[in-house]
């Protein structure tokens, strides 16, 4: 008997071996990402037609050592290729793997092709043509270290191409992988199956095909083994005919029901089309639905929930997934008690959010991505246990509830859309949580090096889950950012090109924020009282805003009746943002000026006069566009001396900065002819009361003679 290699995904080797035994193979041998076996051609044909989890079947022609390209050529040349196929057949060489000498798969494929063609030429036969588009034959060369396997791919295009799927939803599963997940899910034909995040319906369709005893390759038109000299057309026709009859009978006798839900109506339409092409549309009910709200269908008491939720490769960029898994887990326990669930994901942290203990788990790659499938029993006892311990991170939840009760009431009274509800109150949960209208930003501070990465991630996961539970915020409206000590060029780091702008209200003023594109949002929440104060004292005054950022202080001053405003920042992006802020509040006209400039340089040569000046410089800056470094502790007197030249006799400078333990140089200030009053306490809002050093703020005026 001839030798064969069945190829599959890593982690499915034993499952494939069992499947091949059921199809008539004896003594299969498991190898890495495959199974080797010997079998008569009838069994091989059945395996190609009926295997649900093999991706390819290779007829092994030779196994040989490959140290270099000469070994490769000689090994391929040793095969009597004309005895296997005729020269009128087109072919392509698929080369997989490299070693120290053969580092390029295209080069390896070329050497094998040369050996095949040369063998025909030496036999005085025509050269077979090479075709990369639908060739009659595919020659398969697999190289692992110095060991090579050379043979024919009996299938052609991968066996996952069943013929029923032409398009898919997000990140579709290969059909072979989907079939494996069904096999390991605890589902059998006696049970109903539900996929609450079904996408294009692949999991349900594969299960329905199993229930119908429909061969996965029955709709496939082309097989590469048909181009081989020893192809038995009569035997193959008999095996295919038998499979078609079995499929038709199977559809009629199936009692199992299948249910698929997805939030995207267009994806549901695609799933219905896929089921129709697969011939199982009458068995599957597809509907638009939210996995976190899905109800148990009638007669589903012993059913199986199987799904492949979105899992994202980076937890830090997908906080909504934490909330999704948390709510989904709660829904499973509340609605599907007595059923079983099988969830496939690459992220153990997300699976932990389900708050369920797996009975069994299987490691199984999705392509190159390591993933795991976990099976859960959703028992009544588990449901009661969850009811007792429904709170996640109870200490954190209790603090958050308390803060929201106090700060939320104050914010509503003050007419504030944006405020902080948590500011690293508890040492184990080191983050700031801000409300921006209907959105919540969780700003995680970098964990100390003494805390393990796994523990830090688990605490972050718990924080996000608890925040969603306490606030009731929509999961897609949770945004996660990691905050670290900022310096120089990453002070206002751009994050992504999502461009999500919207208006918020602050003491009757409308301001534009952007929660996605930058590390900061366009609004420093700790300065809300400072901005309010500026608006209250700006009437009839010429106002200057330096290091203006998005100009929110200018907007308050203008809305408070300022005679004129000058807004200066080095960033064109922020100046344009400031102009939009002003326009949103109807503050237009030539009395409102905007200037892109290095504020430090501008101060050295400016000669205007102002009644009210607001300056909130960075603690430290070494921007490439600034000609010098700036340190607010070292340079604040120089800064204020320059401002004094432009300050009218009864004018006021509101000077603020965020340097912890900042000390005003009172002697230097007096020498400069200025005096200062510390108003930090008056400008510290309730939502920042715990962080008394978030900023310091001063009223600077001319010293009286």
Swiss-Prot record:
What catalytic reaction does the record list? guanosine(2445) in 23S rRNA + S-adenosyl-L-methionine = N(2)-methylguanosine(2445) in 23S rRNA + S-adenosyl-L-homocysteine + H(+); guanosine(2069) in 23S rRNA + S-adenosyl-L-methionine = N(2)-methylguanosine(2069) in 23S rRNA + S-adenosyl-L-homocysteine + H(+)
Parts forming coiled coils: none
Q: State the Pfam families in the record.
A: Methyltrans_SAM (PF10672), RlmL_1st (PF22020), THUMP (PF02926), UPF0020 (PF01170)
Determine if rRNA processing is one of this entry's keywords.
yes
Cellular-component GO terms for this entry? cytoplasm
- Which keywords label this protein? Cytoplasm, Methyltransferase, RNA-binding, rRNA processing, S-adenosyl-L-methionine, Transferase
Cross-referenced InterPro entries, in alphabetical order? 23SrRNA_methyltr_KL, DNA_methylase_N6_adenine_CS, RlmKL-like_Mtase, RlmKL-like_Mtase_CS, RlmL_1st, SAM-dep_methyl-trfase, SAM-dependent_MTases_sf, THUMP_dom
Give the UniProt subcellular location, in the record's own words.
Cytoplasm
Gene Ontology MF term list: 23S rRNA (guanine(2445)-N(2))-methyltransferase activity; RNA binding; rRNA (guanine-N7-)-methyltransferase activity
Keyword hit for Transcription regulation: no
The EC number of this protein is 2.1.1.173, 2.1.1.264
Q: Which CDD domains match?
A: AdoMet_MTases, THUMP_AdoMetMT
Entry's PROSITE patterns?
THUMP, UPF0020
The THUMP domain sits at: 43-154
- Give the main EC class: transferase
Q: Which family does it belong to?
A: Belongs to the methyltransferase superfamily. RlmKL family.
Name the PANTHER family on file.
Answer: RIBOSOMAL RNA LARGE SUBUNIT METHYLTRANSFERASE K/L (PTHR47313), RIBOSOMAL RNA LARGE SUBUNIT METHYLTRANSFERASE K_L (PTHR47313:SF1)
Q: Which NCBIfam families match?
A: PRK11783.1
What does this protein's UniProt record list under function? Specifically methylates the guanine in position 2445 (m2G2445) and the guanine in position 2069 (m7G2069) of 23S rRNA.
Q: What is this protein called?
A: Ribosomal RNA large subunit methyltransferase K/L
- Protein source organism: Aliivibrio fischeri (strain ATCC 700601 / ES114)
């Amino acid at each position: 008997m001839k030798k064969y290699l069945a190829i599959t995904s890593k982690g499915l080797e034993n499952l494939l071996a069992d499947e091949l035994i059921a199809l008539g193979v004896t003594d299969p041998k498991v190898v890495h990402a495959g199974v080797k076996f010997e079998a008569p051609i009838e069994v091989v044909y059945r395996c190609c037609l009926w295997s649900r989890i093999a991706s390819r079947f290779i007829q092994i022609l030779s196994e040989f050592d490959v140290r270099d390209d000469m070994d490769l050529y000689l090994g391929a040349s040793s095969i009597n290729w004309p005895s296997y196929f005729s020269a009128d057949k087109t072919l392509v060489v698929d080369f997989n793997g490299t070693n120290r000498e053969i580092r390029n798969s295209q080069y390896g494929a070329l050497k094998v092709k040369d050996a095949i063609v040369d063998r025909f030429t030496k036999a005085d036969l025509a050269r077979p043509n090479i075709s990369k588009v639908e060739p009659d034959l595919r020659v398969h060369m697999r190289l692992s270290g110095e060991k090579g396997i050379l043979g024919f791919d009996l299938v052609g295009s991968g066996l996952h191409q069943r013929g029923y799927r032409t398009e898919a939803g997000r990140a579709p599963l290969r059909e072979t992988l989907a079939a494996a997940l069904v096999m390991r899910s605890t589902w059998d034909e006696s049970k109903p199956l539900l996929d609450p995040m079904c996408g294009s319906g692949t999991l349900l369709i594969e299960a329905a095909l199993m229930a119908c005893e429909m061969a996965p390759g029955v709709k496939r038109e082309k097989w590469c083994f048909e181009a081989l000299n020893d192809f038995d057309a009569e035997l193959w026709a008999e095996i295919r005919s038998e499979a078609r009859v079995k499929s038709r009978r199977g559809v009629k006798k199936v009692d199992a029901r299948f249910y698929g839900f997805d939030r995207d109506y267009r994806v549901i339409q695609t799933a219905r089309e896929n089921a129709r092409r697969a011939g199982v549309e009458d068995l599957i009910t597809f509907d638009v639905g939210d996995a976190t709200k899905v109800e148990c269908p009638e007669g589903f008491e012993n059913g199986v929930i199987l799904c492949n939720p979105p899992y994202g490769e980076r937890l830090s960029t997908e906080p909504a997934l934490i909330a999704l898994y948390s709510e989904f887990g709660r829904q499973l326990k509340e609605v599907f008690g007595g059923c079983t669930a099988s969830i496939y994901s690459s992220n153990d942290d997300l699976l932990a959010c389900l708050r369920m203990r797996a009975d069994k788990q299987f490691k199984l790659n999705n392509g190159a991505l390591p993933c795991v499938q976990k099976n859960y029993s959703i028992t009544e006892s588990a449901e009661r246990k969850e009811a007792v311990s429904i709170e996640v991170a109870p200490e954190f939840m209790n603090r958050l509830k308390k803060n929201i009760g106090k700060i939320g009431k104050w914010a509503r009274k003050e007419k504030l859309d944006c405020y902080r509800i948590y500011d690293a109150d508890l040492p184990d949960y080191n983050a700031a949580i801000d409300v921006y209208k209907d959105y919540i930003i969780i700003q995680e501070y970098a964990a100390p090096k003494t805390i393990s990465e796994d523990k830090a991630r688990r605490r972050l996961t718990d924080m996000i889950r608890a925040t969603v539970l306490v606030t009731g915020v929509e999961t897609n409206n949770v945004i996660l950012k990691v905050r670290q000590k900022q310096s120089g060029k990453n002070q206002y780091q751009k994050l992504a090109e999502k461009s999500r702008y919207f208006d918020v209200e602050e003491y009757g003023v409308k301001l534009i924020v952007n929660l996605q594109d930058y590390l900061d949002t366009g609004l420093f929440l700790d300065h809300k009282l400072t901005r309010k104060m500026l608006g209250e004292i700006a009437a009839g005054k010429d106002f200057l805003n330096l290091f203006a950022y998005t100009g929110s202080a200018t907007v308050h001053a203008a809305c408070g009746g300022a005679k004129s405003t000058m807004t200066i920042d080095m960033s064109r992006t922020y100046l344009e943002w400031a102009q939009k802020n002003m326009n949103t509040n109807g503050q237009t006209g030539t009395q409102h000026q905007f200037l892109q400039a290095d504020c430090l340089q501008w101060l050295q040569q400016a000669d205007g006069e102002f009644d009210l000046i607001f300056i909130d410089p960075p603690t430290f800056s070494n921007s490439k566009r600034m000609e010098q470094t700036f340190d607010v502790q070292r340079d604040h007197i120089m800064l204020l001396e320059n401002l004094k030249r432009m300050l009218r006799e009864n004018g006021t400078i509101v000077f603020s900065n965020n340097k912890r333990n900042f000390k005003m140089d009172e002697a230097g200030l007096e020498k400069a002819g200025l005096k200062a009053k510390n108003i930090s306490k008056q400008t510290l809002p309730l939502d920042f009361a715990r962080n008394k050093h978030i900023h310091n703020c001063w009223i600077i005026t001319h010293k009286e003679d």
